[in-house]
């Protein structure tokens, strides 16, 4: 009798493991992967062994501002941006919690654009971008409960989001090859741009007045500080440079006061245009984001601050950090492709090749009017 019970128990456990394995693989395939930028939850969870030393969370200002190619090639800093477009501070709080649940980085950087906005009014896209890619855990449950309360949703909606029903319900109809095979496993989260849009310097640059932050946002900032401190992980706040309003600058000034009171470094690059060397004629892609040129300047300042403050290790050449090498190569190749693309004619294109690929063999595949090269 006992032997039969033992066999049945083993069968039940094997069945549960089988269902869990199949379910996990299906969720990996059907998972909602579009976070509006950054490296993505699925790449974050796949990190094994050698994790990033620096994690960056926040909105598009996070993944459009800190260039992981520069961080790695020039400083050897292994970073990863876990962000989502238009991310609010409540999402940033739970992102920080998830990082601390699974990793122990040297430092976590939080981009605080949402502190300059109004309240924490979440929309459907916030739910999809931020929560559906997260693994089941107590942290996800708390986040979904918070979203349900924030958006005045009932328990059916809450349970459906936690069970990832939005994934299973409709994703089958929009699957692509990317859902079965990650074509960019090396992506560390930087989403740059070569576009250039010219602006005047914002008048708010020198505004030092502070405007009170929304209480909900103070609560989220406090939560991040407490969580990181409990795990012994340093926290850094930063505001990316953009053409901001007087009110937004005043709220960043309030974040600076909060950070000072809580012994958290805060880099507001909207007070540091000259210090960083930002040029509003060439360093911005649009009114809200820097381009590759501007990102490089901000990243170098950030990297030097991190090295001086936290003594981060140089991981270049270390076994287990090959993805950072590949990501840097990917970003470098994008620069080369762009430089070739903006050539005025084929002669300029050909002149650039030996400069860009010195010591390399270049194969040209020609179609059309071959006589143009004569």
Short names for language-model regions:
Residues 7-28:
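Hydrophobic membrane-insertion alpha-helices, especially the h-region
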Residues 29-50:
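Alpha-helical transmembrane signal-anchor/signal-peptide segments
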Residues 57, 61-146:
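Membrane-embedded segments
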Residues 57-60, 82-85, 111-113, 238-242, ...:
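Active-site-proximal beta-strand/loop segments in catalytic clefts of secreted hydrolases
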Residues 86-90, 213-217, 243-250:
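Acidic-and-aromatic substrate-binding clefts and catalytic sites of carbohydrate-active enzymes
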Residues 125-233, 315-337:
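Secreted/periplasmic serine-hydrolase-like ester/acetyl group-modifying domain
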Residues 249-324:
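C-terminal regions of proteins
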Residues 336-374:
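Short acidic-hydrophobic catalytic motif
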